[in-house]
Amino acid sequence: MSLKLDGKKLSLEIEERLNEYISSNKEIAKRAPGLAVIRIGEDPASGVYVNNKEKACSRVGIKSFIFHLKDNIEQKEVEQLINKLNLDKNIDGMLLQLPIPKKFDEQKLISHINPSKDVDGLNEINIGKLVKNEPAMRSCTPAGIINLLRSQNIKIEGKKIVVVGRSLLVGKPLSLMLLNLNGTVTMTHSKTLNLNKVCREADILIAAAGKPNLIDSSFVKEGAIIIDVGIHRLKSSNKNQTRLCGDVLLEDVISKVFAYTPVPGGVGPMTVTMLLVNTIFSWQKQFGLSSNLNDLLP
């Protein structure tokens, strides 16, 4: 039977440790950690994700500050808000909920976020430090995936790893992080020739293409580990209902793989948990708290 990599279970275990850590250090710091989330427009999925982050913050004792801006706001006004939050000593972490309306310069807004508060790890300073393998904020989804693998003692060093997808949010930073851990990484994308053949070489296959059910059994070798980053809401056979699926056609590959992540309940919860970790890391540095946060992770 294939091993289920249960991100929901692991995330709750880590959250419990984070809650204890904040409780034991809040008296020294004189305040709880603070996370600011900037949401622009009315994208329904963004609303769900922001709500999930707010709930997760509440569970561990982080104070969340939600800024929901109308999409008729100007770029300069958003930049001014970011600059204000950069100076706010009650804010340890800040993120721009993506996607945002196309009229905005997304990367320019992200570049305005102080790198020490950039809990999504998307500021060019943090990306540059990742390339150089220097300590910095790490992107949440890649960090969540690595901790999920570590929780089951799945080694990365020396493994052939194929990443399907090259986004700045997942594919690129994940590939760099795996390289820094001595994995042998191949990054693929929609233009890769013979994609299924390339994927069949993988000991660990990570699907982050953003295409529902792209990966079937023809992409997977016997005994591989498959990580599904995708999440899609599709119409079910009952037209009045929808169902969630990932980039992997799980029922087609499950008999071949050694381990897999479910959708939902796999990578998603760990992404949120690593956001909390990054926020607490920034809080810890500001107040010179001595405990090592890595001790709370797998």
Swiss-Prot record:
Keywords: Amino-acid biosynthesis, Histidine biosynthesis, Hydrolase, Methionine biosynthesis, Multifunctional enzyme, NADP, One-carbon metabolism, Oxidoreductase, Purine biosynthesis. NCBIfam families: PRK14186.1. Catalyzes the oxidation of 5,10-methylenetetrahydrofolate to 5,10-methenyltetrahydrofolate and then the hydrolysis of 5,10-methenyltetrahydrofolate to 10-formyltetrahydrofolate. Pfam families: THF_DHG_CYH, THF_DHG_CYH_C. The keyword Amino-acid biosynthesis applies. SUPFAM superfamilies: Aminoacid dehydrogenase-like, N-terminal domain, NAD(P)-binding Rossmann-fold domains. Belongs to the tetrahydrofolate dehydrogenase/cyclohydrolase family. Signal peptide: none annotated. Homodimer. Disulfide bonds: none annotated. Its EC number is 1.5.1.5, 3.5.4.9. GO terms for cellular component: cytosol. One of its GO terms (molecular function) is methylenetetrahydrofolate dehydrogenase (NADP+) activity. InterPro entries: Aminoacid_DH-like_N_sf (IPR046346), NAD(P)-bd_dom_sf (IPR036291), THF_DH/CycHdrlase (IPR000672), THF_DH/CycHdrlase_cat_dom (IPR020630), THF_DH/CycHdrlase_CS (IPR020867), THF_DH/CycHdrlase_NAD-bd_dom (IPR020631). GO terms for biological process: L-histidine biosynthetic process; methionine biosynthetic process; purine nucleotide biosynthetic process; tetrahydrofolate interconversion. NADP(+) binds at G165, R166, S167, S190, I231. It catalyses: (6R)-5,10-methylene-5,6,7,8-tetrahydrofolate + NADP(+) = (6R)-5,10-methenyltetrahydrofolate + NADPH; (6R)-5,10-methenyltetrahydrofolate + H2O = (6R)-10-formyltetrahydrofolate + H(+). This is Bifunctional protein FolD. Pathway: One-carbon metabolism; tetrahydrofolate interconversion.
